[in-house]
Regions:
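Minor-groove-contacting beta-hairpin "wing" of winged helix-turn-helix DNA-binding domains
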Residues: 1-7
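Non-DNA-binding regulatory cores of transcription-related proteins
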Residues: 8-79, 83-85
Length: 87
């Protein structure tokens, strides 16, 4: 059941990234995600539910998400992962 839940969360995250993710930038262990107005909390919740390895947590405003990772390499990998979902 856990594997099915994780797959469903990843599928949902992929769909939401395609629809809502406007831009991604990272510095050190932080990743900043931009969304249309009003969508940041929705996308941040999907990221939290996906339980991506290396993500410590998210903070969402109206159109911006601060995603905190465990390190610089993880920030790069997670940025690439989320951008990959938009293609």
């Amino acid at each position: 059941v856990s594997g099915q839940y994780r797959q469903a969360s990843e599928n949902r995250l992929s769909t939401l990234c395609r629809e809502l993710l406007v831009s991604v930038a990272h510095a050190e262990n932080d990743v900043v995600l931009r969304t249309p107005p009003g969508a940041a909390q929705f996308l941040a919740s999907a990221i939290d539910q996906a339980r991506i390895e290396g993500v410590l947590g998210t903070i969402a405003g109206d159109d911006t998400i601060l995603l905190i990772t465990t390190g610089t390499e993880q920030a790069t990998a997670i940025s690439d992962l989320l951008l990959g979902y938009t293609r």
